[in-house]
Amino acid sequence: MAKRRAAEPLTFRVPWKRLLLSDFPEEPPLWVPPSGTARPLKRQGDAGIMAEPASAPRKRRGGGDDRQELQGCSREPGEPPPGEQEEPRAAGGGDRVESAGSPQVADGVHSQQPEEFWQYNTFQYWRNPLPPLDLAALEDVSANSLTETLEDKNEGVEIDMES
């Protein structure tokens, strides 16, 4: 709102803009809703809609699969497209939840998601992997240095008390 109020004095100082604004008896609306079906402003909390969210899969302008779009952005230049790597999906896009008649397919899809998330997470995808740590070597070093540090502190305390 502040930007609109600040813009009004500027428009009234310019003569040709004053003429444009005088043609409208009222201020023109900032946004005109597109003509067509009226859409509700808020989602309805219908139990049927919440129980079957994938009965009508969402479509985008390209009409392609969402996973292919996401994976295509983060591929290496030499990698084949994801359609050649994956198993063929059922008709209907693949972002639908499978029916109760095929629990094996649904379990396979859910078990694959964390691996894909890790692989295509941009923060971790571009970072160098950490080298493997040998915890046994760390424990040996920390145990030796801890005992040496305790012995050194005790010697320092004895020297301070003598003087």
Curated annotation (Swiss-Prot):
**Mind giving the lineage of the organism this protein is from?**
Eukaryota, Metazoa, Chordata, Craniata, Vertebrata
Which species is this UniProt entry from?
Mus musculus (Mouse)
Which residues lie within the region annotated Disordered?
Answer: 23-113
Modified positions (Phosphoserine) are: 102
Q: Which PANTHER family match?
A: C9ORF40 ISOFORM 1, CHROMOSOME 9 C9ORF40 HOMOLOG
| Protein's UniProt name | Uncharacterized protein C9orf40 homolog
The alphabetized UniProt keywords are: Phosphoprotein
